[in-house]
Amino acid sequence: MKVYAISDLHLSINNPKPMDVFGTVWDNYLDDIVRSLEGMTSDDILLLAGDLSWAMGLPQAVPDLEYIGALPGKKVIIRGNHDYWWKSISAVRSKLPNGVFAVQNDAVKIGDVVVGGSRGWSVDDKSEDGKRLYTRELIRIDMSLQAMQKLKTEGDRTVFMIHYPPFNVKFEGTPVTELFEKYGIDVVVYGHLHGKNCYARKSYTKNGIKYLLTSCDQVNNTAVLVL
């Protein structure tokens, strides 16, 4: 069983919102992503770390969730900052196709892989509201990590999904990365970063944890092999 990741699909199946206005890398990007998944099997896992759909409400997001459900393997999703349709986790789960799992304040175990996740927040947002949101996300991340610990048994592999980068432009340690180290996470996947000028390393290892950027435009619309 292999684990792959790709994020920031920004789907709009029923109400097309052209993404190529953001650059040629977005030309036919969904076709490129699908081609990159052709080698996946039904036993493999695909992680999608947020910004799944442009929809504003859950009913409008259903076609996008069905698109995700039709991708190969078992899918695990988290909320991104543009997923305005994602409000109640129970409501979201009621609309998920078979084989799609949503993580929020908890975790899921598939085979020998335990996956947790949370949206996170920008470490660079020093506004009062930003500090409040960052603190709240720390609590949620810790809840998910605790849930992972309860599911984990000897020999299991652990992956945490977070939408926002967990560190700053200098890749310095943060309260979020300290939590990952405390719980001994193997791999962290994240997205959110876009454009030619963003501070992006596709792979970075710090204190024994591998961090993988999976924003589709940053990885040439090709799913990243995680495990």
Regions found by a protein language model. Give the residues of each.
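N-terminal active-site segment of His-dependent metallophosphoesterases
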Residues: M1-A70, D142-D156
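A short, conserved beta-to-alpha structural element at the edge of catalytic cores
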Residues: N28-G39, I77-A91, L225
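Short, charged, surface-exposed secondary-structure boundary motifs
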Residues: W86-S88, I110-V113, V188-V189, N220-L225
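Conserved catalytic scaffold of divalent metal-dependent phosphoesterases
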Residues: L9-S12, W86-E172
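Metal-dependent catalytic neighborhoods of phosphoester/phosphodiester hydrolases
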Residues: P16, A49-G69, Y84-N98, K126-E128, ...
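His/acidic metal-ligating clusters that form di-metal
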Residues: D32-I45, G69, G130-A200
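Active-site neighborhood of phospho(di)ester-bond hydrolases with catalytic His/Asp-centered motifs
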Residues: A5-S7, L46-D51, K75-N81, F101-Q104, ...
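Binuclear metal-dependent phosphoesterase catalytic core
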Residues: N15-K17, V21-T24, D31-R35, K109, ...
